[in-house]
Amino acid sequence: MASEQNSPDALLSIRSSCNRCRNHKLKCVVTEAPNGTACCQRCIRAMVPCKFGRRERKKRGSSPRVVPQSPWMHSPWETTSTSMQSIYPNTEAMDVGRADALVVHGTNAFPPPANVPAEQSLTGDHSAILTPGSMNMGIFNHLSLDANNLEADDIHAYKFPHGQLHEAHHTQYWHFQADEWRMDHPNDDSHSDYSATSSSKAATAALLQLAADLQERLDALENEPSWRRKNASMDKYPIGSVLQLSSKLQQLGRCLQTDDSSSTQSESSRSRASVGATSSVHRLQMPVLESGTSDACLNVSHLTSTTRFDTSVSLMLLSCFVTLLQISTGVLGHFQDYLHAHPKTRARTLSMSAAQSSIVSLGDLDPQQQTHDRIHTAIYVLLNSLEEVEEALCLPPRVRLAITLQASPRSDGSTSEQEKAMSAAFYGGLSAATEGIDDILTEFGRRVNDTKGMLRQHMDL
């Protein structure tokens, strides 16, 4: 017993979380096992042994005085004391020391905001510097990140300052303005590069989330039964969810665009930082389909426009666009199922009294086929949204499918050169990786034309 008390491990307390929950960073809920020992509920469900380790001894010794190394602790009047109960230093600073801590080599290292008086920069409350759980620095309250006082929305706004998540159709989407991702700092190239990199990473993360949402929506369309089996009417068909996904892709396409000036400025700053190093970001422009070409021959010359995309971003945008086309094709398939299940009905005529009345106007006539009119409107709304996505992705006008289907609709099911050359117009060197894109585009065009033809037959047009 004496040897056990004298051992160094005897003074170390047992952890309140088991080793398995600590490794996975999960909350450990401890319950008493039938044999009287404590066991974690997660370990009980996983049927694995539950072990509670002891806290580790500090590997570095504590010192009553610490030599300051940061600009906040360079003043000789500041002292830092360390206690065994807390790992955070307790900083006690005099007013002179606080004033010196804000001045580095005769200049104010952290200038106050424009709306704060200059004399307030030395009289603010700086006693909370380097205190546990807070970074309240008086005039620098706009930089404080006190997690105990912040709500969930505030923490999310700090992590994603330019975007907000909204719950719609059991999926989270991004809402932001396109100009918020572009930050111009002509006087500071390094700060401009940092801001552009941060906004690009956030937009790329939102693009990955959108790709997952599109795939989830496509799987739901392919696996669920036809809409006519659920409802006899198409009035409550959720067409807005598809339009919202299209709107998100359009916004991300505009946010991720770069131009030659920003690219040149970014590359020049990189060359100054590392002499002789080449840019690691490869830019790619969409090729143009020349007029008068046959068999969808393409010219891979660059566009006259300065809009460009990163190679990795352009591939993700292409994947999202193709998935959106597949979703639109599935929606048109639901419309066709409804038209097949409800055969053509003869239009009703007016009553004798209404037909002989001279005061009956066109607005007094009741619509005979409201559902068919709404389906027809939904088709053009889908095509308009796809046209806006094509513009946001900077597709050449000669290879845009949506505007072609609206301008010259065909009912014979033929395939145009635009549909055949779509994938090659995106990336001429990736034909092996984009073999199925032509089939998806052709199927979408055929489905649009077939649905329009069925509507014309049902509506006697």
From Swiss-Prot:
GO molecular function terms listed in the Swiss-Prot or TrEMBL record: DNA binding; DNA-binding transcription factor activity, RNA polymerase II-specific; zinc ion binding
Keywords, in A-Z order: DNA-binding, Metal-binding, Nucleus, Transcription, Transcription regulation, Zinc
Subcellular compartments: Nucleus
Comp. bias (Low complexity): 256-274
Region (Disordered): 55-79, 256-278
Subcellular location, principal: nucleus
A Gene Ontology cellular-component term: nucleus
InterPro entries linked: Zn2-C6_fun-type_DNA-bd_sf, Zn2Cys6_DnaBD
DNA-binding region(s), residue ranges: 18-50
Annotated function: Transcription factor that regulates the expression of the gene cluster that mediates the biosynthesis of the trans-fused decalin-containing tetramic acid phomasetin.
Stated name of the protein: Transcription factor phm6
Organism: Pyrenochaetopsis sp
The encoding gene: phm6
